[in-house]
């Protein structure tokens, strides 16, 4: 679930604005006040991470919204050249699920889960900035495909001992030439992808660097390969001599348990020089008569071979491991207890290195574990668990198009795929709060398991727009939807062109919400359009039930009936099951040149203590004016009679 969202220098949001978002978040305000601007910033991030071309830092014109070019987005008169967006997410565990959810983007065999288990992610925060680089010769290109400027990503997790650990990574555009980057200037061959990655400077926290140094002792992050604005691979500069010395030391002191992975990461054989052999001879000389042992067992001259023989560390290590068990364990004990073994081997390798040999290399690896988990969660969340339904839904049709192959859970921006999605999943079992649980003032939060079709019919009946709904696959023609309107007309169902527009407006909302997984975020603009005030009122109950099922709903609305229903439910809630923490309401206004967001707090009694001017007060003002006009008319009438 998204818990916080910050926007800066984005259209009418000129100043840095960070809002707390709840399970049900409502935006209300006058037209062109900035409600849609805030939602567009969320859509921008979602359509970017869902985009298949990872080289695009942000996708301005995509599947969810078309925003034009960079200058259309940047606030007029803004003090900064960059647009900044920050999101904070808290993964919600599915308390009803027996098996926690696994990231769909995690590699096969990995164990990255979000749910009730150890090492659970508690919070992820990601801030990204982009610009059009006005000084660049590519400014025209950057207008359509903005340039990545910076990303800051942090992840808070809790282990099985309930100990919290926080990691973070900072990536920003760098103006350094490759020759100025420590560890990269001496590398002879750099391909185009690596060269592009060195345009970004990377900083990792201390815990993450400790994890990196378990594999690469000398690693220094100097670049990054991005997928959009998230890190996919980090480029490290390593000292090859130090890494070879570390590989030898670990293999000797860990009984070879890690040599396979280190050899694979280095990708080459390590040759034992005379200086290294001298160190090993000195360390092991008092342990056992290796020469005699090998003459008896292998008929070889020595453990270290002849002076003319080129000996690789792998071959020598195999000879060492081939000793009889007692002698081998004795030698390994000596090696493990030798405190400065690495320093001596490292010094010997430095001494034996050729004067002009290349001692640095670049390696690329996934980011440290928790940072990788955070990027996978954000990718999975915005690509799969984020859905959007626009304000202008499709008009009623006799037949509806086939479902999109890319996302079989997407009803479409206008709800155009609702019929096919309902037909595809109508027998799927879902968990939801039945409408019967909301027929009393206090909501019963117990969930039931029914098919999607049954759940949709349940809420259609509660809203009073239809008695039943049936979907039918018509082959290449598409899908048909028919509804029954009343019990008296139970023998005949109608297609949506023969019933009120309200059914076609409500169905996409119901299907999209009921089919969504736990820890989804669902965004709606003006869901009340074309709906009777009574239906608008009861729609507040439906969205509240979704929030209680851990499905976050972000709603832009102009409906005072919707707001009043939420106030009633909050006032009616029992003290132990308060609802005001489930709801966040923001009143958006534009006093000067920029949008201003003001939180409207509903207390436990359903009252708004600090009522903003212009916040659904028109009907009350109109009622006062009617009473005032009526009083004046009566007064004038009495005067005329008296005259």
List where the protein language model places each region.
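Switch/communication elements of ASCE P-loop NTPase nucleotide-binding domains
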Residues: 1-93, 443-639
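P-loop NTPase switch/coupling surface
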Residues: 1-396, 447, 471-472, 570-578, ...
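Sequence-level detector for tyrosine residue identity
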Residues: 8, 113-114, 200, 236, ...
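Short, polar loop/linker segments at the starts of domains and inter-domain junctions
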Residues: 22, 99-106, 400-415, 598-604
């Amino acid at each position: 679930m998204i818990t916080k969202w910050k926007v800066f220098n984005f259209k009418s949001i000129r100043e840095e604005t960070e809002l707390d978002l709840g399970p049900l978040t409502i935006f209300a305000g006058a037209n062109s006040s900035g409600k849609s601007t805030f939602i567009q910033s969320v859509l921008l991030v979602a359509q970017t991470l869902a985009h298949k071309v990872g080289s695009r830092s942000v996708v301005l014109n995509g599947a969810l919204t078309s925003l034009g070019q960079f200058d259309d987005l940047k606030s007029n008169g803004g003090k900064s050249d960059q647009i900044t967006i920050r999101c904070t997410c808290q993964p919600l565990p599915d308390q009803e699920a027996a098996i926690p959810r696994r990231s769909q983007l995690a590699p096969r065999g990995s164990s990255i889960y979000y749910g009730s288990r150890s090492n659970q992610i508690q919070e992820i925060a990601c801030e990204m900035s982009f610009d059009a680089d006005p000084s660049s010769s590519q400014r025209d290109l950057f207008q359509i495909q903005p340039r990545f400027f910076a990303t800051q990503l942090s992840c808070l997790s809790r282990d099985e001992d309930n100990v919290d650990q926080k990691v973070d990574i900072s990536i920003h555009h760098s103006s350094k030439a490759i020759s100025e980057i420590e560890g990269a200037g001496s590398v002879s061959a750099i391909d185009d992808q690596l060269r592009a990655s060195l345009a970004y400077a990377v900083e990792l926290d201390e815990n993450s660097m400790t994890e990196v140094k378990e594999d690469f002792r000398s690693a220094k992050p100097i670049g990054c390969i991005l997928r959009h604005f998230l890190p996919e691979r980090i480029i490290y500069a390593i000292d090859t001599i130090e890494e070879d010395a570390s590989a030898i030391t670990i293999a000797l002191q860990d009984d070879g348990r890690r040599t396979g992975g280190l050899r694979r990461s280095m990708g080459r054989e390590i040759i034992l020089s005379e200086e290294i052999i001298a160190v090993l001879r000195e360390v092991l000389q008092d342990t056992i008569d290796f020469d005699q042992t090998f003459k008896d067992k292998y008929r070889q001259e020595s453990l270290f071979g002849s002076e003319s023989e080129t000996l690789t560390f792998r071959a020598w290590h195999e000879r060492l491991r081939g000793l009889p068990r007692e002698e081998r364990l004795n030698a390994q004990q000596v090696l493990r207890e030798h405190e400065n073994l690495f320093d001596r081997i490292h010094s010997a390798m430095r001494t034996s290195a050729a004067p002009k040999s290349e001692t640095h290399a670049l390696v690329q690896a996934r980011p440290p574990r928790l940072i990788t988990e955070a990027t996978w969660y954000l990718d999975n969340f915005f690509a799969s668990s984020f859905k959007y339904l626009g304000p202008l839904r499709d008009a009623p049709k006799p037949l509806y198009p086939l479902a999109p192959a890319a996302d079989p859970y997407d009803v479409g921006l206008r709800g155009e795929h609702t019929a096919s999605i309902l037909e595809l999943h109508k027998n799927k079992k879902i968990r939801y709060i039945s409408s019967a649980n909301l027929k009393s003032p206090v909501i019963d939060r117990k969930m039931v398991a029914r098919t999607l079709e049954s759940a949709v019919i349940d809420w259609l009946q509660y809203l009073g727009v239809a008695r039943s709904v049936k979907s039918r696959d018509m082959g290449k023609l598409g899908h048909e939807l028919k509804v029954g309107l009343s019990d008296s007309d139970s023998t005949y169902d109608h297609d949506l062109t023969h019933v009120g527009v309200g059914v076609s407006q409500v169905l996409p909302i119901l299907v999209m919400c009921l089919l969504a997984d736990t820890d989804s975020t669902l965004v709606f603009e003006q869901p009340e359009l074309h709906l009777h005030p009574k239906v608008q009122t009861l729609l507040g109950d439906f969205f509240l039930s979704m929030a209680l099922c851990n499905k976050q709903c972000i709603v832009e609305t102009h409906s005072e009936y919707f707001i009043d229903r939420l106030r009633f439910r909050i006032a009616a809630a029992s003290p132990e099951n308060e609802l005001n923490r489930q709801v966040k309401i923001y009143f958006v206004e534009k006093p000067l040149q920029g949008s201003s967001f003001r939180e409207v707090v509903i207390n436990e009694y359903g009252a708004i203590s600090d009522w903003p001017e212009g916040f659904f007060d028109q009907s009350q003002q109109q009622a006062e004016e009617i009473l005032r006009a009526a009083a004046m008319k009566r007064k004038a009438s009495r005067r005329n009679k008296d005259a």
